[in-house]
Each structure stands twice: as C-alpha cells, then as structure tokens.
Amino acid sequence: MTLQAIKYSGGKLAIIDQLQLPHVEKYVTIHTSEEGWHAIKEMRVRGAPAIAIVAALALASELTTLIARNQLSSNAIETQTFITEKLHYLVSSRPTAVNLSDAAGKLETIVAESVKMPESTGHAVATAFIQAAEAMLAKDVEDNRMIGEYGAKWISENALSKNFTKATVLTHCNTGSLATAGFGTALGVIRALSSTDTLRHAYCTETRPYNQGSRLTAFELVHDRIPATLITDSMAAALLARAEIGVDAIVVGADRVAANGDTANKIGTYGLAVLAKYHGVKFLVAAPLTTIDLVTKSGNEITIEERPASEVTTVRGTCEDGGASEAVKMETVCIAAEGINVWNPAFDITPGALIDGIITEKGVVEKDSDGLFHLEELFKA
C-alpha cells in the first residue's frame, strides 16, 4: 500500500511530520493557515505539489472551523479579503515552489467568482474555497498516476539499454507520496515501473544537506518494497560509469519549470544532469502542469531560496546506543568546523538543453529538431 502523507476528511487535516522520518511516523494536525505556514517553512511538509495542497487545505480547515463556530463574517467581500490575505501569507512560506503561488492564484479566482454571484454571502464564498481546495487534492493524486504511467512507458520505449529488458533508474531528493498528495511524480514513475514489473532496480541519492533522499525516499521505497539502493550524492558519477549496473535514466521532480524547460529543483539536480549527458543516460523531469511557469521565460528569472547554515553544519538523527524497546531519542550533531562560512542554496537550475523529456499528466514533452521545448502546447485546449 502506497504511503499516505496527507490525511484530510471533513475539514480536518493531518500530515506526517517529515522532520521525524524515517525514525518516527507521526501525524501532526493542522488547524489554521498559520500552522500550515510554519509546517511548510520548517519543512515538516515539503515537495512543491504537497506544499500547495497543504497550504490550501490548512486554510480550508480554518474556514471550516470558523463556519462551525459561527465566527465567519456573513459579508462576502470581507470573507474574500480574509481568504486573499491568508493565501498571500501562505505563499510567503516557500517562494520558489511555483505550485503554491499557482494554487493560490486559482483559488483567489474562484473566490472572486463566488463573490460575484447574486446574493453571495461569506458562508458561500468560504464554501466555494473549501470545495476547490478539496478538488485540488483529488486532482493531484490522479495527475501523479498519469505522470507515472507516461514516464514508465517512455523509459521502457526510449531508455533501456540493449542488455536489459527492465529499467534501472536513479532519482534525487524526494518526489513521492511525501512530496505530493499521493503516489508521487518522479518516484511515481518508479512506482509505475515496479507495478508493471519493468523495474530492475532503483537508486536514490541521500540528497545533502537535508537528506531527503536517505530520510524520505528510502523510507518510501522500503515501505513499498521496491528493490532499491541508497548512495551518497558524490557517488552518482561512479554509479553511472559502471556498465554492469546499467543506469538507464535519471528521473527528478521540479519546483518550477520555466517556459524554455529550465528547471529549478533540489540542489544537486544540475550536477546529475551534467553527469547524465556525459554518460549517455536519459535525464527526465517529472512535473504536473501546475509546476510549469510560462510567465517565467528562463531559469535566470527564478528566485533561489537560501537555507540556514545550520542545515549544512549539523545533522540530526537517532542515537544508536539505546535498546530496541526504548523510546526513539533524536539528537543534533555538529559536523563542521566552528566559524566556517556556509553557502546553502536550496535549489539549482538545470538548463533545458540537458533535459531529454518533461513528464506531465498530459504526456512526455520532448524538444523539437532545434533543441527547444514548446511547453505552451500543453496548455492549449
């Protein structure tokens, strides 16, 4: 059974606290947009699609409570203002992830349309928002499954070496159920390959400095019993050079894809794309349409978030000196020289020229004969 990282029903939202994974599987209840903001900022939830869904549902949960307590304004305009301010606040929690601003923009439009309805009320406006947020949750899961199917088919038809009939795939960061509403994008492709018995083996990078690969992707792969091996980030080149291993494709997710295909994703993605090009390995980006930003023309226009130095100079994990029956004890350990300067960008930009295909819920987009992506075609009816 695929891991469920976001639980939502009847206006009640709970998420797995990813800061405690893989050691403790604990759900945290999110009641308000403020709690949602902190969960995103503190990376208790991460992954561009999941961030957008949690932000929307956090506000939906807050509105549900206000309605139940009769504390919501009956005035449609006042409720619209309340929702809009909360959405802008939520977007500030993770500016690089385009899914968050995209979802907020769509929800603002729905709210604005609701206000225009004859005899609109605050309750009606809030209800329109809640229904739209819940619909986003369901659509994200369905989109992820389509991404998985299209990606698995493309790899089987275009990436397999002549020596193997099943695919070996390397992935980076975490792009599974923990990063989306469910199933995953890049990890969803691996899941789809596994479900059709066309996966030979999966490899995942540890993804320094926050270790999303070792903490989260490895956790999901073990949970789903998918044959997989963890490597450190610096081992990727050696892995691709081993002919007997035969990595067929590298599949990653995205936090923002510019109109020309340039992709912002977890730091280290760019390096993997360069390695893939040198070794003749297919490099694929798996992303829903909500991650594609046609307004941003190239990666040069994407704002790169910088994270605290402590994420590089410390590491957090469990103590191994306790007995199996004892409660899990988490500790933070310093691993760098005190006083050293730190540069910690959360993302890098992979040029579209290094990407072989962008997997979406509408299919896999490849470059034309001039080496250009035409992502705008995806949005035409």
UniProtKB/Swiss-Prot annotation:
One of its GO terms (cellular component) is nucleus. The active site is at 255 (proton donor). It comes from the Eukaryota. Its main location: cytoplasm. It catalyses: 5-(methylsulfanyl)-alpha-D-ribose 1-phosphate = 5-(methylsulfanyl)-D-ribulose 1-phosphate. It is found in: Cytoplasm; Nucleus. Pathway: Amino-acid biosynthesis; L-methionine biosynthesis via salvage pathway; L-methionine from S-methyl-5-thio-alpha-D-ribose 1-phosphate: step 1/6. The record marks 173 as: Transition state stabilizer. One of its GO terms (molecular function) is S-methyl-5-thioribose-1-phosphate isomerase activity. GO terms for biological process: L-methionine salvage from methylthioadenosine. Pfam families: IF-2B. Catalyzes the interconversion of methylthioribose-1-phosphate (MTR-1-P) into methylthioribulose-1-phosphate (MTRu-1-P). Belongs to the eIF-2B alpha/beta/delta subunits family. MtnA subfamily. This is Methylthioribose-1-phosphate isomerase. It comes from Aspergillus oryzae (strain ATCC 42149 / RIB 40). The lineage of its organism: Eukaryota, Fungi, Dikarya, Ascomycota, Pezizomycotina.
